Amino acid sequence: MEKALRLLPLASRLFSLLGMIVLIGLMPWLSGRDPALSLLRARSGEQEATPEALNAIRQQYGLDDGPLLLLGRWFHGVLRGDAGNSWISGRPVLEGMLQATGVSLTLMGYALAVAVVVAILLALPTLWRGLHGENRRPAGVLAVSLTALPEFLLAALLLIVGAVWLQWFPPYGWQSLQHAILPALALGLPAGGLLALLLNDGLAATFSERWLLTWNLAGIARRHCLLAVLRRTLPALLPQVGLVLIGLTGGAIAVEKVFAIPGLGRATLGAAIAQDLPALQCGILILLLLAFGTGFLMQGAHYLLLGRIAAALPNSTPPQHSSRASYIFAAVAALLLCLLVLSGIIRDPFSSLHIRLQPPSLDLPFGADATGRDILARVAYGALNTSLLALAVSFASLSLGIVFGLMPRLMCGIIELANATPPIVAGLLVTAVTGPSPFGAACAVMLVSWAPLSAHCASLLAEARTQPYIRMLPVLGIGRCRTLTHYLLPALWVPLLRHAMLRLPGIALALAALGFLGLGPQPPSAEWGLVLAEGMPYIERAPWGVLAPAVALVLLAVLAVTLANTAGNRRR
C-alpha cells in the first residue's frame, strides 16, 4: 500500500500529460461541430455546405473513420514529424511552425537578456547593504512597478512612445535587431521586475543566516562572502525562474500580435481565430513542450546544483519591512479605479453619438473611438463587466482549488500541468472548442487559476492535521467525513477566500489579455482588452483610444501586484 502511494504522484503526472495529448488530438471533435463543416468554413466562408462538398472533405481527410482512429493517426504522424496539413492553405503545418518557433525563441532570448540585466541592477542595492551588515528586504517599488505591467499593455505603451511619438524604433516587423528592441523590452521588463523581487527576497533571506555573521567575524574577504551568498541563493531560485520563463511563452503571443512578429504565438493565435485546427494543434503542442521543457530543465538544474541536500536546506525567511507604501499604492489605485467607474457608468457605451475619433474634451474626457462611441463610458462599463466576470472566475477557481487540494497526491500532475500552462495558451485551447466568447475566456482563466489555490489548500490541510485537537478526534469517535466538514474545512475557508480575493485583479488582467487577443468578448461588448484592441489600428491618429484603457489597466495591475506583495509580506 505504501509503495502504491509513493507511485501515485508519478502516475498522476503521466496520466495528466497523456490527457493533454489526447485533448489536443481530439480538438476537431470536442467542439460538437462537424469537422468537415469546420474545415469547409476555414477554407471558404462563402461556399455552400452541400452534402456532396462535406462528403468529399470527409473522404479526402478520412474523417469517417472516427475520432479515436484519427487520434492515433495524428499522434503517429507527430512522432514521425508530420503534424498534418493546414485547413486553409493545404500545406504541411510543421515546417512553418518550426520556423515561427525559431523567431519566438530568438525574441524570448532577447527578452531574457533584458530581464537578467534588470534583475541584477535592481538587486545590487540589496547585495551592497547585505555585504556591509545592513540587512533588510527592500520595498521594491520599482520592481513592483515593472511587474505590474502586463506584456500586452506594456507593448502597446512602448509602441505609442517609442515608435509613434519619438519615432526611434520601427513599429512592426522582424527584419533587423532594431525591430527586436521594443518587443524584447515589452517581454523582458515585467519578467525582470519579477526576477528582481525573487532575487531580493532570496538575498535578504541568505544575509539573515547565522553562518554569514560567523564568516564576517572571522575576517573572510567580502568577495568570498559574495560568491558564497550567490551560491546559496541562486540555485534555490531556479524553479521560480522556470515559472518566469514559462510566463514568457504566454506573454510572447500578445507581444508578437502587437508588433506583427512572425513568431509561434502569432501563428497559433491566427490559427485559433481562423479555426485552422491542424495548425492550432501543432502550435499549442509546441508551446506546451516549450513550457514543460523549460520547467523540467530548471528543476533538473536545481537538483544538479544541490543534489540530495536540496530538501535539507533550511527555508530562510527574509526580514519583514513596513508595507505602508504598498498599502498606499493599493489604496490610490483602487480609489482612482472607483472614480473612473463612477464617472463613466452614467454614460452610454454603445451609441455612436460623437464624431469619429473625436479628441478628448470637457464633454468627452477620453475622446471617442473609431465608431464615435464614448471611450470613458466603454472603459467604465469594461471595468464593471471585467470585474464581475473575474469575481465569478475567482469563486469557481476557489471551489476547484479546495476540491483538488483535498487530494494532493492524486492531483499533483494536474496541478503541475495547470501551473505550467499560461492563461493565453489555455485560451487558445478553449477557443478551439467553444469559439471566442466571454464564457470561453472565463473557462480558460479558471482552468489555470485554481492550481495555486489548490497548492495552498494542500499546505493548510497538512498543517491543520498536525494540530493536537485534530489528532484527538478519531479517539473521540468522530469519523473522517465529519472531521473534514466540521473541523478542517472551516479552518481552511477563511485563508483560502482571502487568497482568492487577492488574485481577483490578476484574474481580471488575464481576462483582459484574452479580450485583447480576440479570444474573449466580441464587438460591440465593452471589455477592457477589447477596447484596447479596437484602438490599436488608429494608434497614430488617435492615441487616446489606447491610452484610456491602458491607464485603467495600469491601475488594476498596480493594485494586483501591490496586494500580492503585501500579502506575501504578511504571510512571512
PLM features: what roles do these ranges have?
Residues L17-G66, Q167-H179, L342-A370, Q522:
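Hydrophobic alpha-helical transmembrane segments of membrane transport/permease proteins
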Residues M1-L5, G25, W87-R91, G109-V144, ...:
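Transmembrane-helix boundary motif in ABC transporter permease subunits
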